[in-house]
Each structure stands twice: as structure tokens, then as C-alpha cells.
Amino acid sequence: MAILGIVAEYNPFHNGHLYLLEKSRQQGDFSATVVVMSGNFLQRGEPAFCDKWARAEMALTAGVDLLIELPFCFATRSAYYFAKGAVQLLQRSGVVTHLAFGSESGQLSQLQEIAGILAHEPESYKTALKKRLSQGWSFPLARSSALQEYMGGEKKQLQEILPGPNNILALEYLRVIEEEGIPLLPLTIPRQGSSFHSSDLSPYSSARAIRQALYHNLDWEKITNSISPATEKILQREIALGRAPIGPDSLEQAIMVNLRLVSTDYLREIYEVSEGLEFRIKEATNSCGTLEELRQFIKSKRYSLTRINRTLLYTLFALSKNQVELYDQHGPQYLHILGFSAKGQEILQKIKIKSKLKIFSRGSEMKQARDKNPGTALAEMIKLDCQATDVYSLLFPNPATRRAGRDFTTSPVPGT
């Protein structure tokens, strides 16, 4: 039995996601589709536009069968660790056979060749990479340049492939599959429509363009070309209930307050803080009044704005280097079910037989596992996910909806 796996954020679900879903299904005789989806915080270090259950519901209306949450400790990391956590979660489900993903290039063999270099790190490539990093280059730029040097004659092709955000994730999925010998069969579908950074609205608008339109209260008629009627209905409901929209800098005051209260010793223990960055953050905090000012103050040749954004999020959640080491050593420890269709419920029964991971389809199961396993990777991962949900809930526009403990009280979203 072939089961299709996809990794996504669905922030929100749009026509491009539907295109990937439909085109991927055409590549084989798949009995179901399982999606690993980020929770309330995303890979760029930002909160989602609306919560994870609303986004899961959007996907279910489009034909996804089962949605599993990617834990915060992987969902908010760099592309490699995001991909690693997601691919491990699909593999550890015990039932997923294929992994589909979008890419700007659409050339699987080409992407696999590059991913093989990243996985095995030939000596000359490694030397070129270290040289650039020692010169203060950011990791993405250093890696891109080192690959171009190593692959020589394919420089022009690489210059077209490496910057694409979908290609970047595609390479990391393939790299993890190669490194760990994971038996997932990869499929790539060429990306359709506007680039991530485009603000144009079209039938294949980027999620960013749709969010920007919603933040600025543009006419729904302009937005509906990019999303399904079901997604529109869910978005309108969440906005009416005061559970959306959540802006990318909604945590600004919380982060700024926390940074002014903590010490450089505290910051030094935070994941991704190194080479004296704690002093730069502290200096910036005392002289800046907004997150954007803070990011611009801290950014450098080595630290990109996205990396800084993630690091600032880690400071709020006190995500330490030791914690991350624990999470990476053990990988995903559970399957938190966000939603399922009737077919998804059948797949879930198969997962219960084949997977060694704990499965949480009731909040009480999650709470019990956390309380009975103190200090373990399992308990710490659950604790962090629940903290993330509780903090996220405070961002809802409607104060009446901001209660804590929603992971323990919210059931998986039912599909058809």
C-alpha cells in the first residue's frame, strides 16, 4: 500500500498547495495522504497567521487524510533541521512510503546529485566551505559558493537552483533521506506561480502575498482567486471569532521585555547564540524600540535576518543549546494528531500497529505522557509544544479566546 507524505506549513492553505497535492497524487496509486505540518510557529521564526487546528481544517477540506504536528523544536529551526524532523516523523509513522515536495527546478536527479554532496561532504567541498566560513560568510552563501567551486562546470545551473526557497528545502529533504538511509521515495513537482517574496495576487499567489493582503484588509474578491472557498470560509470564521490575524511581529513586546530583563549569561546558553552574539543582542535591546530595529542592528554578514528572527524567538522560549542537543539526539518522540478524515482514521489504526512512537489524539494522553516521563526528551518536547500554544493563544485579537491548555482540550479536527 502506497501512502503519500508531504511536509507543509499551510500559512494559509492556498491553490499552490492544492496543485502540489493533486499533481503528487497523479504520480502513483496512493491510498492516502499524510501531512506533517508546523504548529503555531514557523520555520522563519514567526507565529502563524491562524492556529494549527484551523490550518489543519483547511487541508482536510482539500483532501488531505491525516495531519501530524511537527514539534516546535524542529518547526522553528534552519532548513536542515526542519527537514530532518519532518522526514523522521514521516518515517517513524511506519506507513508513509513516498515524500512529495515542490521545487523551483522540478529536476529530481539534479537535486539528488547536489543533496548527495551535502550528505557525504567530499574533502575538497568541505575545505572550500570551511574557508568561506572562516572569512565570516553566512552559512547559506558559503555553502552555495563551495558547491559552485566543487561542481565546476555546472556553476550557472547552481546559481539558478540554490537560491530558490523550495529548492533549499527539497535539497534538505533529499539530504536527510541520503544521510540516514530512510526508505522514502521522493517526488518533486515544479512550483507554480509567484515567488515567496512576491506580493502580487494571482491564482497561484504565495502564502506571503495572501497574508499581506489579509493584514491590509484588501477586498476578499481579490484574495479568493488564490484560495479555495473552504479556506476562505475558515479564514473568515477565525477572523470573526478573534483568533486571527496574527502578525509576524505580534510577539514584539514580549521578546523586547524578556531581552531587557535577562542577562548576557542567559543569552549565552540560548541555541544559535555564539561568538559573542549575546553582547550584540543585549546592546541592541537597550537602544532599539522595535523588533525590526533590533534585527537590523544585530544582522551581519554571518547572521541573516531569518536566522536572527529564529534566535530571538528562542530567547523568549529559553530554548537552550543543551535542550536542542537532547531533541536532535532522540528525534521526534510522538505523533500529535491535528486532524483526520475517515480514511485518515483508518491510516491512524495502521500507525498504531506499526509505529513505535506515542500517538496523541486526545489532550489527556499528551498531558499524561508529559507528567509520567519528567526530564525525558518526550516530556521536554511536549512541554515546549504546549508552551508554544499557550504563548500563541495570547496573541489572539479577542481576549476571551486566550485561555491556556488548548493542547489538552482541543480534539483533532474531523474531515469527511
UniProtKB/Swiss-Prot annotation:
Gene Ontology terms describing biological process? tRNA modification
What is its EC class? ligase
* Keyword set, alphabetical order: ATP-binding, Cytoplasm, Ligase, Nucleotide-binding, RNA-binding, tRNA processing, tRNA-binding
Q: Which Gene3D superfamilies match?
A: HUPs
EC numbers for this chain: 6.3.4.-
Catalytic activity entry: cytidine(34) in elongator tRNA(Met) + acetate + ATP = N(4)-acetylcytidine(34) in elongator tRNA(Met) + AMP + diphosphate
Mind telling me which GO cellular component terms the entry cites? cytoplasm
**Localization in the cell:** Cytoplasm
Molecular function (GO) terms for this protein are: ATP binding; ligase activity, forming carbon-nitrogen bonds; tRNA binding
Q: Name one Pfam family in it.
A: HIGH_NTase1
Where is ATP bound in this sequence? 7-20, 102, 166, 191
HAMAP family, alphabetized: TmcAL (MF_01539)
- Similarity section: Belongs to the TmcAL family.
According to its UniProt entry, the function of this protein is described as: Catalyzes the formation of N(4)-acetylcytidine (ac(4)C) at the wobble position of elongator tRNA(Met), using acetate and ATP as substrates. First activates an acetate ion to form acetyladenylate (Ac-AMP) and then transfers the acetyl group to tRNA to form ac(4)C34.
Protein name per the record: tRNA(Met) cytidine acetate ligase
Query: What species does this protein belong to?
Result: Syntrophomonas wolfei subsp. wolfei (strain DSM 2245B / Goettingen)
Q: Which gene encodes it?
A: tmcAL
